[in-house]
C-alpha cells in the first residue's frame, strides 16, 4: 500500500485536513512540509534573522474573500511576508481550479523570469478558472467537517483589504502519513 501525505491545519475555528500532492508538486509540498515541521531554514521577516521552529504556528488567515478563497502563511499577517526565499511554480496539467477546496500557493506572478512562491497559500471556496497556470495547486481539503471549517472561515466578517475583523488563527500544522 502506498502512503499519502496529509496536513492538519488546526485553527481557532476548527481543524482542516488536506491531502497533499507530492507527485504533482514535489518542491512545493516539500517546502510546505518542511516549513510546517520547522526543518527548513528561513528568515524571520520580523527580525531579518534566521528563524527556527514551525513556521506557520500562530499565524493568521490574513485575507478572506467570501465566494473565492481564504489566504494564510504570512508570519507578518499583512500579505507581503515570507520565508526570505522564493521558488518557481509547479503547474501540473492534471490539476486545475475546476473544483472547490483546493490548496494552492499564493504568489506575485513572476519576477525576472522566476516564480515568487514562498510560504503564503490559499484554499479555494469556488472554481477560479482564471488562476489556472498561474498558481501551483498542491493539495485538496478532504472530509465534510474540514470543508465546513473552510466555509466557516470563508464567511467571517471582514474589513479593509479583506482582513478578518476577528483573527482567524492557524494554531498549528501537523503533517501525517497515512496508508492509501
Predicted feature descriptions by range:
Residues 1-180:
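Cyclophilin-like peptidyl-prolyl cis-trans isomerases
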Amino acid at each position: 500500500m502506498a502512503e499519502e501525505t496529509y496536513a492538519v491545519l488546526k485553527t481557532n475555528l476548527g481543524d482542516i485536513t488536506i491531502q497533499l500532492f507530492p507527485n504533482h508538486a514535489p518542491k512545493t509540498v516539500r517546502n510546505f512540509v518542511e516549513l510546517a515541521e520547522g526543518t527548513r531554514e528561513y528568515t524571520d521577516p520580523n527580525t531579518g534573522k534566521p528563524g527556527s521552529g514551525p513556521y506557520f504556528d500562530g499565524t493568521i488567515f490574513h485575507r478572506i474573500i467570501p465566494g473565492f478563497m481564504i489566504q494564510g502563511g504570512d508570519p507578518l499577517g499583512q500579505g507581503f511576508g515570507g520565508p526570505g526565499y522564493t521558488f518557481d511554480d509547479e503547474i501540473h496539467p492534471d490539476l486545475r481550479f475546476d473544483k472547490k477546496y483546493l490548496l494552492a500557493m499564493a504568489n506575485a506572478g513572476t519576477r525576472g523570469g522566476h516564480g515568487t512562491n514562498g510560504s503564503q497559500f490559499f484554499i479555494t471556496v469556488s472554481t477560479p478558472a482564471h488562476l489556472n497556470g498561474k498558481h501551483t495547486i498542491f493539495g485538496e481539503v478532504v472530509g465534510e467537517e474540514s470543508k465546513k471549517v473552510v466555509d466557516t472561515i470563508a464567511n467571517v466578517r471582514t474589513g479593509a483589504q479583506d482582513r478578518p475583523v476577528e483573527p482567524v488563527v492557524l494554531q498549528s500544522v501537523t503533517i501525517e502519513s497515512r496508508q492509501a
